Each structure stands twice: as C-alpha cells, then as structure tokens.
Amino acid sequence: MEPNNSFRVDSEFRYTLFPIFYSIVFVLGVIANSYVLWVFARLYPSKKFNEIKIFMVNLTMADLLFLVTLPLWIVYYYNQGDWILPKFLCNLAGCFFFINTYCSVAFLAVITYNRFQAVTRPIKTAQATTRKRGFLLSLIIWVSIVGAASYFFVLDSTNSEPKKTGSGNITRCFEHYEKGSIPVLIIHIFLVFSFFLVFLIILFCNLVIIRTLLTQQVQMQRNAEVKRRALWMVCTVLAVFVICFVPHHLVQLPWTLAELGFQDTDFHQGINDAHQVTLCLLSTNCVLDPIIYCFLTKKFRKHLTEKLYSMRESRKCSRATSETGTEVVVQLKDAPIKSLKY
C-alpha cells in the first residue's frame, strides 16, 4: 500500500464534547473510585485481602491514574486542541491513558477468570491460597503495561500545526503519525488483535458462567440471591467491555490506517469523527468499574446499602422536622396573646 498525501482532518465537535464529557467523568469517577478505596481501607484489613479484592484495588488505582490526567485533556480541548502546558505533561497524559486502558482490560480479565474458576471448580477454588497469586499477577500486569507505556515518555509527543485562521501555530498532543509508518501500524495491529483475543476469552468464560448458573438447581433463597448477583456481575463486566472498550478497538485500526495515509480523505473524516466518540466511551470505564464491586463483595454492597438507607432516613427526618416546625409556628401565630405565658 502506498500512502496518500491527504490533508489533516479534524473533528471540531470534539472541542465542545470533550471538555463537557470529561468534566462529568472526572467528577463522578473521582468520587466513585475514592469512595471504593476508602471503603476497602475501612472494611478490609490488608491481611484479609483475597485475590479478587487485590484485583479490584488495582483496577481502582488504574482508573485514578487516568482520572488525574483528565483536567489536562479538558484544558487541551477547551483551547481548541492547542497544548499550552509543558510538553512532559503531554507525555504523562498519554502514558496514563495507555496504562488505564490496558490495565483495566487485564484486571477485568483476571477478575472474570477468578469468577470462572469459582463457578466451574468451587471446591478447588475455595481451598486454594490465592492471595500470593493475586499479588503476583497484579505485579506482572503492572510491570508489563507500565513497561510498554514507558514508550510514551521517550516519544516526541507534540507537533506544531498552522492555525486554520492562518495566523500562528498550535501545538498538538499525540495527534501526529508519520505518513506510511509501518512500525506504528504493526504496534496498533498488535494492540487491537491482543485486545480481541482477551475479549474472546472473557466472553467465553462469562458464557460458561451464565450457562452453569442457569442450569444449577437452586434450593435455598440465599443461594438464589447469590446466583442473581453473580449473573448481574457477569452482565456488568460484559457491558463495560461492550460499551467502553470494543467500540474503540473496532475503530482504532481503520483510524490508524487513515492517519498513516492509507485511506482516502472522505473515509478519513468519517472514521476520525467515530474515533472521537469512542474515546469518550473509553473514558466511561472509570465510572462503570465501581459498579462491578457491588456484585463482587458482600461487605462493600452492605456498606453502600447502609449508607444510602442512612441518607434517605436522614432526609426524611429533616423533612419531618421542618414540617413540625412549620406547624408550631402556625399554631403560635394563631394563638391568642393572653394564652402566651412567660
């Protein structure tokens, strides 16, 4: 394939979409993930962390790494795609974006496999000492992905482009590919195919879990509740993948080909527009991941339910107090003066 020399396309709607969308994700994500860490620190001593809880904490940390860089991207898109911050922050933002994306995929994969083992081999899983394995797998995931992400620290991440007005230049952040670069294409092919391999494994494990749970005989109400939660957990994990990760990786390879100049201009514009939307969807995993924890741990779910109930009762009390106070004021106002004794 020979690259063409099409002009640089842009999707200008992103300069409105990203600041608004990322601001919402930032607020909700920081609140949700900080609360998750607080609950885990309060409810679970470190010695009682089993494999699944270790994976959950690591997934939360990966989400927070991305969330702390969202203000940088908000400033970038608010300034019409002009990186006005120090260059190293562009490298840092790109690095954390990569870490969050693939650490999230990896930890969701090992969480799914853990649940797969618990359903298909419950006795063996219950007897296994999995705490060390949890730490070891987490270490392998972090070292592998952070090692791969270190590429973004040495990469020349910014480039200058003339403004559309014709006066001066703007600085882009991770928006430049050398036309016809085969190494860049190979890297993206590897990432996309690796993702879909992991996704197929996760899909297989979840389908086996669903089938096993649906074919089991439920003899007790408590077991029925456990089964229902397990099914919801499976559906939530699949939903996170389908909503957040699959659209981005479906678009990523065609978009890369267009960026490298192997597609015509009309296709490039359309796929670039789609790519911006999938980037928004990708960021929502930071908000959706904490939902999975509600179905994975009994203590977490109980603590959250108690807090929500307490807040609801507090509002009822406040409203009742307010209404009682109003009634007293009305009664005093209507009472004869002589009946008021001091």
Curated annotation (Swiss-Prot):
The keyword Disulfide bond belongs to this UniProt entry's keyword annotation: yes
CDD domains given in the database record: 7tmA_PAFR
Domain of life: Eukaryota
Topological region Extracellular: 1-16, 75-91, 156-184, 255-276
GO biological process, alphabetically ordered: chemotaxis; transmembrane transport
Any matching Pfam family: 7tm_1
Residue intervals on the Cytoplasmic side: 39-54, 114-133, 206-233, 297-342
UniProt xrefs under Gene3D superfamilies: Rhodopsin 7-helix transmembrane proteins
GO cellular component terms given for this protein: membrane; plasma membrane
Topology versus the membrane: Multi-pass membrane protein
Keywords, in A-Z order: Cell membrane, Chemotaxis, Disulfide bond, G-protein coupled receptor, Glycoprotein, Membrane, Receptor, Transducer, Transmembrane, Transmembrane helix
Membrane-traversing stretches: 17-38, 55-74, 92-113, 134-155, 185-205, 234-254, 277-296
PROSITE patterns: G_PROTEIN_RECEP_F1_1 (PS00237), G_PROTEIN_RECEP_F1_2 (PS50262)
Entry's localization field: Cell membrane
Entry function: Receptor for platelet activating factor, a chemotactic phospholipid mediator that possesses potent inflammatory, smooth-muscle contractile and hypotensive activity. Seems to mediate its action via a G protein that activates a phosphatidylinositol-calcium second messenger system.
PANTHER family: P2Y PURINOCEPTOR-RELATED G-PROTEIN COUPLED RECEPTOR, PLATELET-ACTIVATING FACTOR RECEPTOR
Subunit structure and binding partners: Interacts with ARRB1.
Official protein name in the record: Platelet-activating factor receptor
Organism annotation: Capra hircus (Goat)
Gene designation: PTAFR
